[in-house]
């Protein structure tokens, strides 16, 4: 899968990296999880995705055509931010491309930026 970051996401990472020292490693682990969700064969992927989304770990925000926008809890090694970071990304399933759209802490804001999602959805 190909990964890209939108400019606003880079700003989010820069701001949070000051408080969350393990952030880059946490994002790398998230990439492996995304690979498991979307990089498998269709039959394996459907069952794994169903089980993963059934928990409180992630949810599909929007689905238009072959693009899914997903919000996922980002697991971190930094104690004070454990369970509080959220990663929003768009997956173009047919192209095997993932765009990281937003990274935020629940301490800073309660929800994702809807305007940013509309800008990058599709």
Where are these regions (language model features)?
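Arg/Lys-rich, positively charged N-terminal/basic patches that mediate binding to nucleic acids
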Residues: 1-40
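A broad, low-specificity signal marking well-ordered, structured residues that form hydrophobic/aromatic
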Residues: 3, 70, 98
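Residue-level signal for alpha-helical context at structural boundaries
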Residues: 27-34, 45-48, 106
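Charged, low-complexity, helix/coiled-coil-prone segments
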Residues: 28, 56-71, 104-117
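A short, surface-exposed loop/turn module that caps and links secondary-structure elements
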Residues: 37-78
């Amino acid at each position: 899968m190909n990964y890209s970051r939108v400019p606003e996401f880079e700003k989010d990472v820069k701001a949070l990296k000051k408080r969350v020292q393990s952030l880059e490693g946490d994002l790398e682990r998230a990439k492996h999880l995304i690979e498991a969700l979307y990089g498998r064969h269709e039959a394996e992927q459907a069952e794994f995705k169903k089980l993963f989304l059934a928990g409180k770990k992630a949810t599909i925000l929007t689905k238009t055509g072959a693009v899914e926008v997903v919000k996922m809890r980002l697991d971190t090694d930094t104690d004070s931010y454990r369970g509080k970071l959220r990663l929003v990304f768009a997956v173009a399933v047919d192209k095997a491309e993932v765009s990281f759209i937003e990274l935020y802490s629940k301490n800073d804001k309660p929800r994702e930026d809807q305007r940013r999602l509309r800008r990058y959805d599709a």
